[in-house]
Amino acid sequence: MRPEAAGVREARGRLCHCPGDDPGRLPLPRGPESSIPAPWRPWMSPPPGDAELTRTERPCESWGDQHTSGSKGAFGFQHPVRLYLPVSKRQEYLQSSGEKVLASFPVQATIHFYNDDSESGSEEEQEEEAQPNHLQCLEAEVRDSAQEERAE
């Protein structure tokens, strides 16, 4: 090893060392009595003494899927969290209210639409059956243009 490299190594040792590297220093306390707070993990329940994050009331059934098994996460919600909105309000959601709902919700969630009126669903199906689909329109255009070419 070159002497210049040894000098760099010594300089690094003096400039950069961890507090735990000093043999004369006591080790940092670890465990529950430590003064350093544990990092917050949203998928885990808050510590029992943390009153800010503890939620005593149950979330509304329509705001989350309460039928899956597992432990409760942040704010007392069970993950995955699903917000249910009626299909009739889908357009309103797409315009503005969905963004507001998700922004005001305290945890990450997905929005699922449900059929709120069985009659409206059957009406939509009847309308779809009455309207020709895109492929049928293209086929009709091709046939029409072929007939026009033959006529000329």
From Swiss-Prot:
Annotated region (Ripply homology domain), positions in chain: 79-114
Compositional bias per record (Basic and acidic residues), positions renumbered to this chain: 1-24, 140-152
Annotated Acidic residues bias: 116-130
Region annotation Disordered: where it falls in the sequence: 1-76, 113-152
Main location: nucleus
Highest taxon in the source lineage: Eukaryota
Motif (WRPW motif): 40-43
Keyword Electron transport: no
Phenotype seen when the gene is deleted: Mice are viable, fertile and morphologically normal. Show abnormal development of pharyngeal derivatives, including ectopic formation of the thymus and the parathyroid gland, as well as cardiovascular malformation.
Compartment annotation: Nucleus
Signal peptide: none
Domain-related comment: The Ripply homology domain and the WRPW motif are both necessary for its transcriptional corepressor activity on the transcription activator TBX1.
Protein name, as recorded: Protein ripply3
Lineage per the UniProt record: Eukaryota, Metazoa, Chordata, Craniata, Vertebrata
